[in-house]
């Protein structure tokens, strides 16, 4: 088989994206309608969640269609730097397109948490291992138990949650006492895609934690990098 033959089979581009940004209710309805019309015309499939705190979604379509969709979304949100990751698929990854208005784009269950106002400090991928090796740091995996079993950074705290809603209770029971005993510890968090640890950092800041960091837009591929024992 020629080298290019395998590439010809890959017809579809997948985009996983999110952005914490304040959106008015009336704007949500307009954005939902325009994106739904575009997805229908371009035969894009997937799911998008829209809320007053931003947008979160995963879609699949031809490369040109996905490029047009992301450009349209950025225009509607009035941003130029939406958090998006791309991958490829030999077939359409989803059955239909759904755009939904929700209370949260990632559910933690606390109305007062607002990542559009405050989040932790970003850690670049190239600086992550240095943070892991810092004896004055504590690292938290904000993913659920199922995801953690697939792979994680050695030494990271596992909250043992089945859903993100359980994270605040774990913080109150386990993390708060730890930081009270060791107030100089820096907190670092990671997840898949970046959305959960970004919102988790907003929650920690709201709870009074000061030295809060999170890995910028981590993916499963990053989990293969060296970890501390």
Predicted regions and their residues:
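Extended, charged alpha/beta regions that create polyanion-binding interfaces
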Residues: 63-112
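Short Gly/Ser/Thr- and Asp/Glu-enriched loop/turn motifs at secondary-structure junctions
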Residues: 50-55
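Catalytic cysteine-centered active loop of the rhodanese-like fold, especially the PTP/DSP P-loop
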Residues: 57, 172-218
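Short glycine-/aliphatic-rich beta-strand segments at the starts of folded cytosolic domains
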Residues: 3-24
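Short amphipathic alpha-helix segments
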Residues: 25-42
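Short beta-strand-to-loop capping motifs
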Residues: 19-21, 57-61
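Single conserved hydrophobic/aromatic residue that forms the stacking wall/gate
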Residues: 222-229
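Positively charged, proline/Ser/Thr-rich regional signature most characteristic
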Residues: 105-183
